[in-house]
Amino acid sequence: MGRSPCCDQDKGVKKGPWLPEEDDKLTAYINENGYGNWRSLPKLAGLNRCGKSCRLRWMNYLRPDIRRGKFSDGEESTIVRLHALLGNKWSKIAGHLPGRTDNEIKNYWNTHMRKKLLQMGIDPVTHEPRTNDLSPILDVSQMLAAAINNGQFGNNNLLNNNTALEDILKLQLIHKMLQIITPKAIPNISSFKTNLLNPKPEPVVNSFNTNSVNPKPDPPAGLFINQSGITPEAASDFIPSYENVWDGFEDNQLPGLVTVSQESLNTAKPGTSTTTKVNDHIRTGMMPCYYGDQLLETPSTGSVSVSPETTSLNHPSTAQHSSGSDFLEDWEKFLDDETSDSCWKSFLDLTSPTSSPVPW
């Protein structure tokens, strides 16, 4: 259980600051008789104080051998060494420092020594390097700004590249954390910054042979130029736009793929009326076909009257939304008609790999 405080037994004792007269009585009694038993000393010395208050006043202020003033470097090193061995046993630590009291050492440790160890990155409890110390990392932005101002990066484009700044900042953070966690030397990150700021172009790897790294070859100059002299750029001008493809079919201007009546044409073309009936046939001519970037012209030899079903097949915007099976059936029926020798047959033959005009 321990002893109860002496002040609980002494009711009505004086508390608070000591007066000079009380200091003189305590000093005179101890110099003449010694302190002896601190519980009985106040009555013997004629003081209205408790024994604990008399002891603390003598040990911390009235002793003749007490040392006052700033702690020396030798005393600080002794305190750190003894604290690592003994912990917070201030009375035992004070026994190794003549003239210093345990209360004075404790106050000095809490106000000065503890903060100094934290600034040095040392845990004041275990006296080992701190692994959760973030203070070296907090000044990375200042270090980065100073490096940029001093021109250490040697690249003014870094200021306009937020991604490079973020990457360098991450490298700085990782480097600091590794320095704190691992005691071994960490490689300098200047090489990382050099590779980051001056990246080398990546070569093109041949997909057929992964062991060889070759630049991408340019295609032959005349590969995509046909005999008629039409280049891919010129042929692209002849390709119709899918948005306004029906605007060019004005009054019997449909190419000669099939023979169409004006009634069927009016039915297929959006925005026209089906009441007008014209029996004139559309002229036959050359049907332009495209293979890649090449413009090919094939004469239309067959003629077939187009029904609304096939007309809707040629113009998707007017066709009703049907299932995939209906579409395939209509397409097969269309291919089985008299168009085996037409432009579509030629176009299908051109798309086959065996009859491709372009050598691969």
UniProtKB/Swiss-Prot annotation:
It is found in: Nucleus. Residues 299-324 are annotated as: Disordered. Pfam families: Myb_DNA-binding. GO terms for cellular component: Casparian strip; nucleus. One of its GO terms (biological process) is positive regulation of DNA-templated transcription. Residues 38-62, 90-113 bind DNA. Residues 10-62, 63-117 form the HTH myb-type domain. Its main location: nucleus. This is Transcription factor MYB39. InterPro entries: Homeodomain-like_sf, Myb_dom, Myb_TF_plants, SANT/Myb.
